[in-house]
Amino acid sequence: MNPRTLFSRFASRFLYLGAARNPILVAAAVICAAALSFAQTAPLSMSISGPYAFKDAPALAGYQVTVTNTSQAILSNISLSNALSSGDGAYLIAAQPSQGTCDLGGQGITTLSCSVGSLDPGASINISIAAQMVSGTMTLSSSASGLDANSAPVSAGPVQRATVHGNPLAGTPSVSISLSANPTPKDLVGGRTGTLNWTLQNSTGVRANKLVFAMVIDSRMSISSSAVTGSNAGDSVSCGAPVPGVPGTNIVFCNIDYLGGTSGGSGGSATVTQLQITVNYRSPVVSSQTTLLATGNLSFDGTDSSNPAATGQVRVK
């Protein structure tokens, strides 16, 4: 039997038998029960990271939602609800979990649900979310629910992040990260392979955390792989498979734990200030020369004063 349940039953019987005999014992039991209740932690915890502000709009914002099982048992049937609120038509473009699936986004869509299955004790799931800012403030709100080992419902959240157009709130981190795009080759014959390259550099000495790089890529490019190079071996870096974005595009999310700063990386080695992100693809066969576009959009847990977005163009013959 669960120790908390056993204690609860014992305390109830203790109170019933001893209430009339010794009020001091009753008070002690109540204090113990309250202390046990206070020490309990919710089996699910959540956090959210993303941009606090964009200098210019419209802009694509990338968020990362993390759900963690803080209990000692497997949690099952975990689902997430993600809702975007604004007053000007901002919408959710796409969402991608590190396990499981999410609904498709698109223009006019402001809620996306994700089903992520089970979560082992101590394990976490990350969900990358791309939202289109139109002109004003938008707020992403996420909550999670599931079942514990006894099939009792558990929940967490909501957690929220508001992103404003203009100056961020005082005290929030602000960093200028340079971003450039360099597809190779820039001209190629239809049916041939090419590579999309982006370079991220943070030379400010201020560390940027929880970076989300969302690449909006013409869906006629058949993506075969994507990767981040230049990070420390122990750093948390991952890129997901392409997911549908706005019509005619796919989105590839890459999540990067940090970039730049004055301290070492999570592995204790030298600080990484520059990263390269590459996407390998095969071009479509076309009847006339066509220009294909791929735009990389960078967000992190703070504000980028340079609004980093870089577009690569490829001419296919």
Where are the predicted features?
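Bacterial N-terminal signal peptides
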Residues: 21-35
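Low-complexity, intrinsically disordered segments enriched in Ser/Thr together with acidic residues
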Residues: 115-138, 146, 255-288
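Hydrophobic beta-strand positions in extracellular immunoglobulin-like domains
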Residues: 50, 67, 131, 144-146, ...
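Extracellular/luminal low-complexity Ser/Thr/Pro-rich, glycosylation-prone repeat/linker regions
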Residues: 40-47, 103, 139-184, 234-239, ...
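A surface/secretory-pathway sequence property marking extracellular, secreted
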Residues: 76-113, 117, 210-212, 216-259, ...
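N-terminal secretory signal peptides that target proteins for export/translocation
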Residues: 1-20
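Short beta-strand elements of extracellular/lumenal beta-sandwich folds
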Residues: 57-76, 190-209
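Surface-exposed, proline-enriched loop/turn segments that connect beta strands in immunoglobulin-like
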Residues: 48-52, 97, 114-115, 179-184
